[in-house]
């Protein structure tokens, strides 16, 4: 997972931090995995 996130986002923020505030739609629990704070 680390390699994948580090490759796509440049830093493993996907698993490290859950940007709940970035997902006001309430889908943060699964969106945070695929779409980190970078998006």
From Swiss-Prot:
Organism: Oryctolagus cuniculus
CC terms in the record's Gene Ontology section: extracellular space; secretory granule
Valine amide modification, residue list: 13
The name this protein goes by in its record: Pro-opiomelanocortin
InterPro entries registered for this protein in UniProt: Mcrtin_ACTH_cent (IPR013531), PMOC (IPR001941), POMC-derived_peptides (IPR050878)
Annotated family: Belongs to the POMC family.
Function: Precursor protein for pituitary hormones that regulate stress and environmental adaptation.
Entry-annotated residues carrying Phosphoserine: 31
Alphabetical keyword list: Acetylation, Amidation, Cleavage on pair of basic residues, Hormone, Phosphoprotein, Secreted
């Amino acid at each position: 997972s680390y390699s994948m996130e580090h490759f796509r986002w440049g830093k493993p923020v996907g698993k490290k931090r859950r940007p709940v505030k970035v997902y006001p739609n309430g889908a943060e629990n699964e969106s945070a995995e695929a779409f980190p704070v970078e998006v």
